């Protein structure tokens, strides 16, 4: 019984630490309705908001909800996303952001009644790539790995087998705002939930190489 109580206490402590970590993050464009419960972020996405710069459409917008922490160096970030998508371009997922002109957002985007794995990469101007899903997915895991000057973006339906959806440039040796974003450019908003958000530090590959090369000095 004591072991069981100790195990439960440890689990409760871990959940508390994770919840506190989520609570300590920051809003950029805070939505009117949001909540954190059981280490999950829920929000009603602000209507007619988005992140996009110039290309194809000729406008720049930077006004969608984004809940983030700031990280330097190399890392892996992932999250489980579930959305009640309703209107064209309703979207949610991860965002890695240096500033208004340099960011990557990746997740699910609802277009013409279809669910798409979507990535937007912005360096002064935005580009957009999609992978259409054959059928709606109740949830998707999105993962991004930042190594040196590149970010690899992956998706998964079970948090076990991941498939790459994009490899994109992101400036090296620069702090990055990392977190969860959602937007409803053409709609009236929707309910979005983010679960199991985590960021794992990855040792700097160049430092490890230097240490290996200079081990005997």
Model-derived features: positions:
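Extracellular glycan-recognition regions
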Residues: 20-217
């Amino acid at each position: 019984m004591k072991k069981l109580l100790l195990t439960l206490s440890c689990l409760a402590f871990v959940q508390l630490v994770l919840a506190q970590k989520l609570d300590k993050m920051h809003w950029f464009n805070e939505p009117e309705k949001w909540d954190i419960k059981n280490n999950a972020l829920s929000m009603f996405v602000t209507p007619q908001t988005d992140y996009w710069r110039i290309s194809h459409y000729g406008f720049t917008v930077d006004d969608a909800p984004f809940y983030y922490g700031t990280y330097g160096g190399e890392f892996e970030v992932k999250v489980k996303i579930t959305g009640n998508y309703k209107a064209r371009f309703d979207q949610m997922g991860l965002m890695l952001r240096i500033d208004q002109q340099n960011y990557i957002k990746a997740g699910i985007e609802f277009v013409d009644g279809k669910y798409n794995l979507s990535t937007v990469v912005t360096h002064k101007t935005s580009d957009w790539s999609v992978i259409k899903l054959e059928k709606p997915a109740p949830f998707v895991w999105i993962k991004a790995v930042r190594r040196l000057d590149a970010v690899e973006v992956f998706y998964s339906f079970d948090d076990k087998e991941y498939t790459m959806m994009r490899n994109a440039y992101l400036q090296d040796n620069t702090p990055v705002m990392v977190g969860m974003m959602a937007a409803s450019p053409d709609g009236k908003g929707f309910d979005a939930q983010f679960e199991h958000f985590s960021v794992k530090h990855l040792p700097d590959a160049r430092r490890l190489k230097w240490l290996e090369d200079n081990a005997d000095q």
